[in-house]
Amino acid sequence: MYIPKYFKVTNAEEIWNFVQENSFGTVVTTEQGKPIATHLPLGFNKKDDHYYITGHFAYGNPQWRTFEACEDVLVMFQGPHAYISSSWYSRENVPTWNYQAVHMYGKASMLEKDELAEELTIMLEKYEKHRDNPVLWDKLSPKLLESELKGIVGFKIKVEDIQAAYKLSQNRNETDYMNVIEQLQNEENPNAKQMAELMEDKLKKQI
């Protein structure tokens, strides 16, 4: 991914927190030179000094079979993004787009049945445990679980390279930066308001 120096993020902990908060990613592989992608909720864990991404495909999704021929995988994550009008700058310029994006490259392998059950248990806990009536793995009937496991294929990806870009108007002067925040706050688009919040948070960390 092309990343100008202003926008490059290298803090591993910061990136890891980002992908866990924006865990609906895009898994990209190739088959005979043709890219294939699936959008999936993903899990994350760290063992020793290595990071892993976990997830599962529907059995009927042919993409999982590409892991057998090609282990190399790209996983993409995206945060809020927003259009930035150059009318918000103090000097003439062209419009642009602010965004957060992380690309992770790695080697994929398939999960065994017990590993898949563990991955699903953790995922359900993440999204359900805070609810009034949480749907947790150990609360579901064995018959239902067995049926569901037959319909999906689990995988894990050992992360080998991480590229992260947070384009948050870091290349603008203070006046322009503050005005971009104000203008984004006035936009009706929820993404724009989230982008304004991110830019404010970044500014506070610099103070």
Curated annotation (Swiss-Prot):
Encoding gene, per UniProt annotation: paiB
Domain of life, per the record?
Bacteria
Q: Which SUPFAM superfamilies match?
A: FMN-binding split barrel (SSF50475)
What InterPro entries does this protein's entry cite? Answer: Split_barrel_FMN-bd (IPR012349), TR_PAI2-type (IPR007396)
Q: Which family does the record claim for this protein?
A: Belongs to the PaiB family.
Which species expresses this protein natively?
Answer: Bacillus subtilis (strain 168)
Q: Which keywords are on file for this protein?
A: Sporulation
Q: What is this protein's name?
A: Protease synthase and sporulation protein PAI 2
Q: Name one GO biological process term.
A: sporulation resulting in formation of a cellular spore
Q: Does the keyword Hydrolase apply?
A: no
The keyword rRNA-binding belongs to this UniProt entry's keyword annotation: no
- Described purpose of this protein according to its UniProt entry: Involved in the reduction of extracellular and cell-associated protease levels, as well as in the reduced levels of alpha-amylase, levansucrase, alkaline phosphatase and sporulation inhibition, when present in high copy number.
